[in-house]
Amino acid sequence: MNATTQTRFDIEGLKRVFEAGDVDKVLEFYSEDLEHIEIDAGAPPSSPRTSDFEHLGNALRGAAQGGIKLRMENTVAGGNRAACTITCEFPDGRRLVSNTIYDLKDGKIVRQSDVQVTDPE
């Protein structure tokens, strides 16, 4: 692959496996050297929470096992970026909504940046 060739990112494929709760298939969309950044009430922009591929996998498995319903909407992809809105609905009715930006390299997600808000308990 030369420098001008880009691998197209299948955001709709990611949406399908994400909403189906197929964690192993979701993780195939990610680079193993992922940088995951989360900004929320407990982790402001000046001090965001950061994690890696393994942590993301554990979080997704926990969501699937905990009965959390996941939706991915407003998907867009182009060039070396993709974005979406993710909604997680917890069994108690609370919701988390995240605006997510994916940075891509060679068709894989290398950085995921989430700005999220959760219903109060």
Whereabouts are the PLM-identified features?
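Short, low-complexity N-terminal intrinsically disordered segments enriched in polar/charged residues
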Residues: M1-E28, E32-D33, E121
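Short, solvent-exposed coil/turn segments at beta-strand boundaries
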Residues: D33, A77-A82, Y102-V110
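Short beta-strand segments that buttress and anchor functional surface loops
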Residues: C84-P91
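Short loop/turn motifs at secondary-structure junctions and domain boundaries
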Residues: V17, Q65-G66, D92-R94
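Ligand-binding pocket scaffold of soluble enzyme catalytic domains
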Residues: M72, N80, D92
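A solvent-exposed, acidic/Ser-Thr-rich amphipathic alpha-helical stretch
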Residues: V23-A77
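Short beta-strand edge/turn micro-motifs at domain boundaries
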Residues: R95-E121
